[in-house]
Amino acid sequence: MSFDSLPALPLDPLPDAALPTAPRRRQTVSVNVGGVMVGSAHPIVVQSMTNTDTANAEATAIQVAQLARAGSEIVRVTVNTREAAAAVPELVQRLADIGVHVPIVGDFHYNGHLLLREYPETARLLAKYRINPGNVGAGQRHDENFATMIEVAKEFDKPVRIGVNWGSLDQQVLARLMDENAAAGHPKSPTDVTIDAMIVSALDSARFAEELGLGHDKILISVKVSSAPELWQVYRQLAPLCDYPLHLGLTEAGMGMKGIVASSVALAPLLTEGIGDTIRVSLTPEPGAPRKLEVEVAQQILQSLGLRQFLPQVTSCPGCGRTTSSFFQTLAQKIQDFIRESMPEWKAKYPGVEDMQVAVMGCVVNGPGESKHANIGISLPGTGEDPRAPVYQDGKLLTTLKGPRIAEEFQELLEKYVEERYGQGVAQG
């Protein structure tokens, strides 16, 4: 068959409806969490949580600072004992002393009604209270204890997150819905009933909080499970039923690669549907691994979806038989680390630097092309190629590097480019 006999392909542009667009956010109210605005009118917020004993204010302050400097915009701490509650003022002061100003959220289970009343200064300093309606108390005490926490929130003008978890669901609500389901003509599966119970628990708690006088714009909701399909189901059912901001995350994502993949798979579909106003990636840290990894993964999920831009994107090839060594991989990692370490200073001095594109390529096949498309890029020599590395800036050849200091010289060129390209707005202002 000759190519001439093949049917012509349509070259008409796709209709607008078929073109990919940024997801339209589900409309929600705006909630102020210690100066960070959460809701559909604002960027999706990255949260994290410490794993230190909050009673150890020094260790907790160190970890909060690490998380905040990595880019966490809200940090949650466990408040589970009197010692932990008593340590919150010291924690906040330690953070202020080192110039870290990030909203601190108190995570309460079982005894939050007692701790918030006994430690009013802690209640005043926390930016938000997380309340789990599944473990605030049983029977009459459930409503009494919940009401106490809401009264404290009203007194100190604080928002609350009604945080329902699959593993600690209100058993009274679940039992009632299970009984109703058993009597139905076409009963649902236990999983579906459990998801219904999570939604009922969350919305009933939110309505009760409003009946107690808490403002509609003081409430956020989460309904967390530990698997992606159930997370999609519960949030897709919940989203049309309210306009409270929703916090997304798996309860337990797992460790390492498994946790990163599970969180990415779970969150991405909802975020692309416009569901979700804050996110947390709940990774189990590997031994010796920094806690801040959960922040970096959350940022990368949002950045990969085009929902936020946190730091310049480094494009690098995976490597193949054409590459002479792993040098380009080492350089790509060095540049990525250099950018992340530099971002706190760059973000303050150079507006727009987070949109910069950097390319670190390993051979002549795609290297020059990718480097030209980036703001600044380097194409390292592959097997059999001339041992020189051309550097492209804004699509044009800037210089050619060679010798043992290629990495250091490219880093210097990158820093100079940032100063010249993104420092103009500062100089003009």
Curated annotation (Swiss-Prot):
The record lists the organism as Deinococcus radiodurans (strain ATCC 13939 / DSM 20539 / JCM 16871 / CCUG 27074 / LMG 4051 / NBRC 15346 / NCIMB 9279 / VKM B-1422 / R1)
Cofactor(s) named in the record:
[4Fe-4S] cluster
Origin organism lineage: Bacteria, Thermotogati, Deinococcota, Deinococci, Deinococcales
Annotated pathway: Isoprenoid biosynthesis; isopentenyl diphosphate biosynthesis via DXP pathway; isopentenyl diphosphate from 1-deoxy-D-xylulose 5-phosphate: step 5/6
Q: What is this protein called?
A: 4-hydroxy-3-methylbut-2-en-1-yl diphosphate synthase (flavodoxin)
Domain of life assignment: Bacteria
**What InterPro entries has UniProt attached to this entry?**
Dihydropteroate_synth-like_sf (IPR011005), IspG_bac (IPR016425), IspG_bac-typ (IPR004588), NO2/SO3_Rdtase_4Fe4S_sf (IPR045854)
- What exactly does this protein do? Converts 2C-methyl-D-erythritol 2,4-cyclodiphosphate (ME-2,4cPP) into 1-hydroxy-2-methyl-2-(E)-butenyl 4-diphosphate.
Binding locations of [4Fe-4S] cluster: C317, C320, C363, E370
What keyword terms does UniProt attach to this protein?
Answer: 4Fe-4S, Iron, Iron-sulfur, Isoprene biosynthesis, Metal-binding, Oxidoreductase
Catalytic reaction annotation: (2E)-4-hydroxy-3-methylbut-2-enyl diphosphate + oxidized [flavodoxin] + H2O + 2 H(+) = 2-C-methyl-D-erythritol 2,4-cyclic diphosphate + reduced [flavodoxin]
Q: Which family does it belong to?
A: Belongs to the IspG family.
One MF term from GO for this chain? Answer: 4-hydroxy-3-methylbut-2-en-1-yl diphosphate synthase activity (ferredoxin)
Could you tell me what the cofactor note in this record states? Binds 1 [4Fe-4S] cluster.
Q: Which Pfam family is one of those matched by this entry? A: GcpE
Has UniProt tagged this entry with the keyword 4Fe-4S? yes
Q: What is its EC number?
A: 1.17.7.3
Which HAMAP family does the record match to this protein? Answer: IspG
Task: Name the Gene Ontology biological process terms.
Answer: isopentenyl diphosphate biosynthetic process, methylerythritol 4-phosphate pathway; terpenoid biosynthetic process
